[in-house]
Amino acid sequence: MFPMVTGFMSYGQQTIRAARYIGQSFIITLSHTNRLPITIHYPYEKSITSERFRGRIHFEFDKCIACEVCVRVCPIDLPLVDWRFEKDIKRKQLLNYSIDFGVCIFCGNCVEYCPTNCLSMTEEYELSTYDRHELNYNQIALSRLPISIMGDYTIQTIRNSTQSKIDEEKSWNSRTITDY
């Protein structure tokens, strides 16, 4: 009779333990009902990128000295740099610079080691196309700023607000106070 009682007690303990686990899981599930959704509706809402986000590379043709440091530090030797040596000025002249973003791993080494800071990472991450050859950007395509930066409402608002402050200061300084 004694083993039968211990069997019922262990069965009862297992039942209570299972009910406790189910109750804890149910509480966790119900706690998520008050939270806002984490996902966003992508085409209509854009996610805000972090400060250190590594997106498409921006290239400034005038700053580049054709030193090819970016090619040497790239793990896949990706940037293609074409240049010629100008004997009259004794310097390299950059002819063409291109990066294939279909192959690029966005490691950021080229940006980090560039001595003239002619390369920078943008926040642009929408690089999808139907043709992989469209991902090969030359110096003209690389020099374009992303649309998000050019058409950003906050940047325009900041520009306008600083301009209006300057105009207010000019008008305030130009006033003369006369006592009657």
From Swiss-Prot:
Question: What does the note accompanying the cofactor annotation read?
Answer: Binds 2 [4Fe-4S] clusters per subunit.
Reactions catalysed, as given in the entry: a plastoquinone + NADH + (n+1) H(+)(in) = a plastoquinol + NAD(+) + n H(+)(out); a plastoquinone + NADPH + (n+1) H(+)(in) = a plastoquinol + NADP(+) + n H(+)(out)
One biological process term in Gene Ontology: photosynthesis, light reaction
- The answer to whether the entry has keyword Lyase is no
Q: In which residues is [4Fe-4S] cluster 1 bound?
A: C64, C67, C70, C114
Q: What is its main location?
A: plastid
Recorded GO cellular component terms are: chloroplast thylakoid membrane; plastid
User: Which keywords label this protein?
Assistant: 4Fe-4S, Chloroplast, Iron, Iron-sulfur, Membrane, Metal-binding, NAD, NADP, Plastid, Plastoquinone, Quinone, Repeat, Thylakoid, Translocase
Q: What class of enzyme is it?
A: translocase
- What is a single Pfam family found in this protein's UniProt entry? Fer4_10
UniProt-recorded Gene Ontology molecular function terms: 4 iron, 4 sulfur cluster binding; iron ion binding; NADH dehydrogenase (ubiquinone) activity; quinone binding
Classification via PROSITE patterns: 4FE4S_FER_1, 4FE4S_FER_2
Cofactor(s) listed in the protein's UniProt record: [4Fe-4S] cluster
Q: What is its EC number?
A: 7.1.1.-
Q: Which domain of life is it from?
A: Eukaryota
Indicate how the chain sits in the lipid bilayer: Peripheral membrane protein
Residues that bind [4Fe-4S] cluster 2: C74, C104, C107, C110
On whether 4Fe-4S is a keyword of this UniProt record, the answer is: yes
Record localization: Plastid, Chloroplast thylakoid membrane
Q: Which residues form the 4Fe-4S ferredoxin-type domain?
A: 55-84, 95-124
* Summary of the function given for this chain in its UniProt record: NDH shuttles electrons from NAD(P)H:plastoquinone, via FMN and iron-sulfur (Fe-S) centers, to quinones in the photosynthetic chain and possibly in a chloroplast respiratory chain. The immediate electron acceptor for the enzyme in this species is believed to be plastoquinone. Couples the redox reaction to proton translocation, and thus conserves the redox energy in a proton gradient.
Give the family this protein belongs to, as stated in its UniProt record: Belongs to the complex I 23 kDa subunit family.
**HAMAP family membership:** NDH1_NuoI
Quaternary state and partners of this protein? NDH is composed of at least 16 different subunits, 5 of which are encoded in the nucleus.
What is the protein name given in its UniProt record?
Answer: NAD(P)H-quinone oxidoreductase subunit I, chloroplastic
